[in-house]
C-alpha cells in the first residue's frame, strides 16, 4: 500500500508544475551556437525536470552532424543543461562534384562523417553563416586532394569513397610525431596515397595497412638523411625507396 502511495505521489509530482524547466543551458559546443542547439533540442513547453523526455531531446540533437554524443543533465531546481561532445575536423577534402571539374571543400570528421561544406569565400553569405571556429580548424587540418569525380558529400552522411577512407586511415593511423608535420594528402587512388609534409617531403604510403611500420621507416630515413630527402616510397614497407633533394 505504501509503495502505491509513493507511486501515485511521484506521478502527481512529475506532472505538476514543480521543477519546471525555466532555463536551457549548453556546454561543450564550439561549432554550434547555444541558440542553434536550444532550437534543435525543442524542449516542449511545460516540461519539468521530472517528466522531460531526455532521450527525445538527445535524439534530436544527435541529428546534427557536429554532435558526436550528448547528455541531457537536470540541474535542480529549474535548469536543463545540454552537454555536447562535438566531432572535430580531421581533414578537409577537395571533392570534384561534377563532370565540369567543379571542386568543393568539405570538412570530414575522424569517424568519416561529412560535417559541412566550406565555402572558398569566407565573406560570402554562405561563408558568414559558418562560425569562425570552422574556418580556423579547417586551416589547421590536413587537406585531402586529387579525389576523382564520383563522390557526393552530404552533411550528416558517412563518406563511402575508398580513396578518402584510405587517406583518413593514413592520417589517423600515424602518431603525432609525423601527423603533426603533414600538410596535404593526394588520394587519386588507394594504392597511390601520398602525404606531403610541411617541409616539402613527399611520402608515398599507398594503402593504410601497416601504417605504424611505414611511419617508423620514414622517421628513421628522415633522421639518417636529414635535409637530404625529397621523396620516400613505403608502399612496400620492407622495401623502402627514397630520393634525395
Locations of regions flagged by a protein language model:
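Charged, solvent-exposed interaction patches on well-folded alpha/beta domains
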Residues: 1-8, 71, 77-245
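Terminal hydrophobic membrane-targeting helix
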Residues: 12-117
Amino acid at each position: 500500500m505504501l509503495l502505491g502511495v509513493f507511486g501515485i505521489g511521484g506521478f502527481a509530482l512529475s506532472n505538476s508544475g514543480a521543477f519546471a524547466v525555466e532555463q536551457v543551458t549548453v556546454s561543450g559546443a564550439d561549432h554550434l551556437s547555444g541558440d542553434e542547439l536550444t532550437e534543435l533540442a525543442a524542449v516542449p513547453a511545460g516540461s519539468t525536470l521530472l517528466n522531460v523526455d531526455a532521450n527525445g531531446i538527445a535524439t534530436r540533437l544527435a541529428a546534427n552532424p557536429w554532435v558526436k554524443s550528448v547528455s541531457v543533465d537536470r540541474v535542480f531546481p529549474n535548469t536543463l543543461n545540454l552537454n555536447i561532445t562535438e566531432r572535430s575536423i580531421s581533414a578537409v577534402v577537395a571533392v570534384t562534384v561534377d563532370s565540369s571539374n567543379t571542386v568543393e571543400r568539405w570538412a570530414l570528421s575522424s569517424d568519416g562523417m561529412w560535417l559541412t561544406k566550406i565555402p572558398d569565400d569566407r565573406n560570402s553569405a554562405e561563408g558568414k553563416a559558418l562560425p569562425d571556429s570552422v574556418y580556423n580548424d579547417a586551416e589547421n587540418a590536413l587537406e585531402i586532394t586529387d579525389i576523382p569525380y564520383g563522390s557526393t558529400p552530404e552533411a550528416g552522411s558517412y563518406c563511402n569513397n575508398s580513396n578518402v577512407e584510405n587517406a583518413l586511415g593514413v592520417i589517423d593511423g600515424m602518431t603525432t610525431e609525423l601527423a603533426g608535420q603533414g600538410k596535404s594528402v593526394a588520394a587519386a587512388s588507394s594504392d597511390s596515397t601520398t602525404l606531403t609534409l610541411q617541409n616539402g617531403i613527399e611520402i608515398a604510403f599507398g594503402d593504410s595497412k601497416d601504417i605504424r611500420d611505414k611511419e617508423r621507416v620514414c622517421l628513421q630515413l628522415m633522421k639518417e638523411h636529414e635535409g637530404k630527402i625529397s621523396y620516400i616510397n613505403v608502399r612496400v614497407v620492407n622495401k623502402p625507396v627514397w630520393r634525395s633533394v
